[in-house]
């Protein structure tokens, strides 16, 4: 995904792109290649002094990079006062139109809980607990349910593999 307006949800389907840009007179065509397979934006890295610094977690996990480039991968955790050097590093980004609560075990009043794993009912990012499936579903679920609910909560997501990218996106999306 890359056709998103600043700080809003990233589109994962052609109709999401249309909704963002339907009033833009410069947009004349949208190519529909189906839903995105990964569902999250790319991993952004900085190659510096024979090191791979992860600036933004994405579809390629730190573990996958470490497998290909042992002892060269460094995770960069952005500090509040650091300069933004890559897309998606704003503290508030990827946000739905309604409040989002993260690491929720139960829904609060007037709130939809989006689950993860076998202990949650529908809607569920992945009943099987697949982080790849959850990443693929994340933005399309948020786009769909922000139109139907005034508040959304998301169950805890393991912070490993592509789960780091999922948690990064929902943490930024939950900022007010």
What is each stretch, according to the model?
Residues 1-176:
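Active-site-adjacent structural elements in enzyme catalytic cores
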């Amino acid at each position: 995904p890359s056709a998103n307006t600043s700080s809003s949800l990233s589109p994962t389907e052609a109709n999401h792109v249309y909704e963002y840009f339907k009033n833009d007179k410069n947009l004349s065509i949208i190519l529909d290649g189906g839903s995105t397979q990964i569902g999250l934006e790319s991993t952004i890295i900085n190659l510096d002094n024979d090191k791979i610094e992860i600036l933004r977690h994405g579809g390629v996990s730190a573990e996958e990079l470490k497998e290909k480039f042992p002892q060269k991968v460094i995770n960069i955790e952005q500090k509040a006062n650091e300069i933004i050097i890559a897309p998606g590093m704003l503290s508030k980004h990827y946000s739905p139109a309604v409040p989002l609560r993260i690491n929720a075990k139960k829904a609060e009043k007037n709130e939809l809980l989006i689950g993860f794993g076998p202990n949650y009912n529908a809607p569920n990012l992945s009943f099987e607990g697949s982080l790849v499936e959850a990443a693929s579903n994340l933005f399309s679920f948020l786009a769909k349910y922000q139109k139907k609910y005034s508040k959304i909560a998301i169950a805890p997501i393991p912070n490993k593999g592509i789960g780091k990218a999922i948690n990064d996106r929902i943490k930024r999306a939950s900022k007010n």
